[in-house]
Amino acid sequence: MRYMLDTNICIYIIKRHPPQVLHRLATLAQGSAVMSVVSYAELRAGLEIQTANRAQDERVLALLISRIPVLPFTESGAESFGVLRAAVRDRRRDTMDQLIAAHAVSTGVTLVTNNDADFKDYPGLKVENWALNT
């Protein structure tokens, strides 16, 4: 099974907390976890905004993307976005989350997030939460 890591899960990996996220990631075969280019964009934006520890965080993010492939957003993702946006007409939902959901659906992977509620009701989207203590 392949997994797409939501932005919050990537942040947990970078911060090395909570430990259960790191443990679950460690159980996967190489290449089983991927990141959407949308999550990478969110991480880059966060890095640009902050001033403290900038050089260190640049290195950590570079290490993360060297180990977790960043998938490009394709026409298939755009088509999935249209379907999901039409299915869930709540325009208050975050567009970035909708793009990540569409990307996961279009690539046939399970989305890993700690924000389950943000991704409910999207048709065809499979979600797991590795941050829960189980």
Description of each model-found segment:
Residues 33-40, 114:
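Substrate-recognition element of Asp-dependent hydrolases with the DxDx(T/V) motif
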Residues 68-112:
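Active-site neighborhoods of divalent-metal-dependent phosphate/nucleic-acid chemistry enzymes
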Residues 1-35, 47-63, 133-134:
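Short, well-structured N-terminal submotif of metal-dependent ribonuclease cores
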Residues 6-7, 21, 43, 81, ...:
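Generic structural signal for small/hydrophobic residues in well-ordered secondary structure
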Residues 9-10, 39, 77, 100, ...:
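Alpha-helix capping/helix-boundary segments
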Residues 1, 101, 105-134:
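Acidic, PIN/NYN-like endoribonuclease modules and their adjacent C-terminal/linker elements
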Residues 64-66, 123:
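Short, structured coil segments at secondary-structure junctions
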